């Protein structure tokens, strides 16, 4: 624990790895600046401004794009999404259903265009510490106060106001997912790649759809580590029903004692379009690569 504390003092994403999930009853999101949509939902698709990077946020917005939300991904020319430096198929899978925009928020033109995008957005999703935007003069609370019924989704490791940071791997370890039900002398290991990211992305997308459906706006503060701990604890403590998948003569089923639920056969998602590339300011790139004015 002393090593973890020293790492956190240095601003590193580190965590202890408890043997048992510690998230029983953990609160994984908070809601503030609540409001209700004053008018009927517009007939146009919901507009989402995606300021998130890496995996959890981009996965949430990718799923929302599949649900007919119009998603525009905004990147900084000096600090683009780091996932773009990794495997291209993964980046395309996360962002191929979105349009893209490159904006320098330290330049007057970039700020003007960004503020116009903020004004037209119904939903904002970001995964930075609050001070990253506040240093540039942007505040979630102020944006929400002027726009009843709109949503601002913030995804961080432990919460917007928490001093600790986290990425998917260490958040999963902090949730107790580095150990399997095995002998006590077994060493810890990662259970999948950065599991806290997809768990958080799925929950974020579901929460956005739920709030949008009933017209409830506000700031949704999602914390990856507590959320993953809650999911892990539910499985560990038997709070959920474990359904075992298995092939059947007429397709796949989930089998729970005497109950059998037909499901589609498992399959990997396929890349349907290339992610929008970073393009010149004042332009938007579609997934087909054609530039058009914003």
Task: Briefly describe each language-model feature range.
Residues 1-82, 111, 115, 120-123, ...:
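Acyl-CoA thioester-binding alpha/beta core of soluble enzymes
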Residues 98, 190-193:
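Short beta-alpha connecting loops at secondary-structure transitions
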Residues 69, 73-101:
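Glycine-rich phosphate-binding loop and adjoining beta1-alpha1-beta2 segment
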Residues 53, 105, 128-130, 156-157, ...:
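Short glycine-/small-residue-rich Rossmann-like dinucleotide-binding loops
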Residues 49, 94-145:
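A structured beta-alpha segment of the ubiquitous adenosine-cofactor-binding alpha/beta core
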Residues 139-144, 164, 168-172:
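Glycine-rich beta-alpha-beta "Rossmann" dinucleotide-binding loop(s) and their flanking helix/strand
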Residues 104, 160, 167, 194-198:
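Hydrophobic alpha-helical scaffolding
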Residues 46, 98, 168, 176-177, ...:
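Residue-level detector of functionally special positions within alpha-helical transmembrane segments
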């Amino acid at each position: 624990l002393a090593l973890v504390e020293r790492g956190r003092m240095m601003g590193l994403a580190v965590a202890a790895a408890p043997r048992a999930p510690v998230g029983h009853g953990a609160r994984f999101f908070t809601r503030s600046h609540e409001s209700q949509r004053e008018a009927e939902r517009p007939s146009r698709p919901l507009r989402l401004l995606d300021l998130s990077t890496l995996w959890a946020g981009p996965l949430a917005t990718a799923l929302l794009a599949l649900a007919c939300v119009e998603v525009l991904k905004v990147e900084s020319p000096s600090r683009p999404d780091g996932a773009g430096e990794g495997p291209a198929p993964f980046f395309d899978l996360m962002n191929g259903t979105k349009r893209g925009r490159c904006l320098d928020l330290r330049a007057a033109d970039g700020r003007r265009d960004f503020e116009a995008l903020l004004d037209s957005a119904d939903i904002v999703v970001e995964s930075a510490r609050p001070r990253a935007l506040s240093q540039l003069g942007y505040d979630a609370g102020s944006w929400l106060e002027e726009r009843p019924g709109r949503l601002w989704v913030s995804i961080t490791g432990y919460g917007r106001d928490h001093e600790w940071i986290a990425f998917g791997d260490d958040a999963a370890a902090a949730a107790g997912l580095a150990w399997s039900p095995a002998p006590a002398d077994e060493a810890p290991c990662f259970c999948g790649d950065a599991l806290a990211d997809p768990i958080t992305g799925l929950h974020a997308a579901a929460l956005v759809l739920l709030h949008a459906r009933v017209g409830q706006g506000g700031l949704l503060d999602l914390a990856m580590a507590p959320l993953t701990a809650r999911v892990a604890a539910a499985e560990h403590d038997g709070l959920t029903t474990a359904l075992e998948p298995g092939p059947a003569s007429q397709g796949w089923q989930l089998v729970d004692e005497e109950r059998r639920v037909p499901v589609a056969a498992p399959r990997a998602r396929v890349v349907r379009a290339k992610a929008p590339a970073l393009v010149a300011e004042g332009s938007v790139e579609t997934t087909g690569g054609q530039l058009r004015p914003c």
